């Protein structure tokens, strides 16, 4: 079964200029083998229906497409059980031990060690370890786009970026949900990225993933004989260096330094990269690049953990 990206046929017509009408674009997509249009019928809408009714388009093409959709539904048992599982049944599957083990294995095997000059693995004899970066004290940064956390926090996004959905930049209707109780929306300094450094987003994390520990919490749990010096240091985007001095002081005091680097994957105005959030520059954020250079002059072992994005 071949399914379009959200707004894919509309994009082909409006941006790529394929087809004289949206119906013709839909016909060309169906002829090429696309069975379903998402998220709603536009190319596969009234104009394409009229092409089939009038005989302008061969109904055999429609029959083949409908057949593939029906076959997929029969294979999945959707005619016998057309509704989603109830809460308890769904929860039972989500909490299966085998699934958790596979998820952990996948996470471990997806990590890439780019370079190691003998710093790793960390010695148990480290007295002071500096942990610096915006990802270290927030477990949300472990979760990428389209995870439950990402989608729930996007409800509070000041602007949507999901292609093909009302409220997206393409629709010209930017500006939707705001924080509850009239709370102002805060942004990463000097950027249009909405900050998630608010209690509301911590509550979402605790609600959905109550046992998920941050990097800081995990290090404290595992390195009980080491003093962990945590400092925020710099944001996930932009040029802000206002917290550098406190972080550099931690670098000077520490035996080893861990820097969390990269942006925040997600969607809408809540992320630096993800669904509909593009970047023209693949380098590290300017503030992070500047901090690495500033920290390197002290000659301490620096470990960079790149979380996501640039």
Language-model features: locations:
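Mobile "lid/hinge" segments at catalytic clefts and subdomain interfaces of large enzymes
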Residues: 30-40, 44
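Conserved, charged catalytic cores of large soluble enzymes
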Residues: 45-46, 67, 71-92
């Amino acid at each position: 079964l071949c399914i379009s990206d959200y707004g894919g046929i509309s994009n082909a017509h409006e941006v790529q200029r394929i087809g004289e009408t949206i119906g013709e674009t839909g016909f060309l997509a169906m002829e090429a083998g696309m069975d379903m249009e998402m998220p709603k019928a536009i190319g596969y809408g009234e104009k394409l229906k009229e092409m089939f009714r009038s005989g302008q388009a061969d109904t055999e093409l429609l029959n083949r497409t409908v057949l593939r959709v029906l076959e997929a539904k029969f294979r999945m048992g959707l005619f016998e059980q057309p509704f989603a599982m109830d809460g308890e049944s769904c929860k039972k599957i989500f909490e299966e031990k085998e699934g958790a083990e596979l998820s952990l294995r996948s996470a471990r095997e997806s990590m890439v060690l780019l370079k190691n000059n003998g710093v790793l693995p960390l010695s148990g004899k480290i007295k002071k370890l500096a942990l610096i970066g915006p990802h270290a004290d927030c477990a949300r940064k472990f979760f990428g786009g389209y995870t439950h956390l990402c989608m729930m926090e996007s409800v509070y996004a000041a602007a949507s970026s999901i292609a093909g959905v009302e409220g997206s930049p393409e629709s010209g209707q930017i500006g939707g949900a705001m924080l509850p109780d009239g709370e102002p929306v805060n942004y990463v300094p000097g950027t249009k990225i909405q900050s998630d450094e608010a209690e509301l987003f911590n509550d979402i994390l605790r609600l959905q993933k109550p046992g998920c520990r941050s990097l800081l919490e995990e290090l404290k749990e595992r390195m009980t004989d080491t003093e962990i010096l945590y400092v925020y240091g710099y944001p996930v985007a932009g040029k802000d260096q206002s917290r550098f001095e406190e972080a550099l002081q931690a670098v000077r005091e520490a035996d080893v330094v861990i820097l969390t680097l990269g942006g925040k994957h997600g969607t809408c105005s809540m992320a630096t990269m993800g669904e509909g959030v593009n970047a023209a520059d693949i380098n590290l954020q300017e503030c992070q690049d500047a901090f690495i250079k500033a920290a390197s002059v002290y000659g301490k072992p620096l470990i960079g953990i790149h979380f996501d994005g640039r």
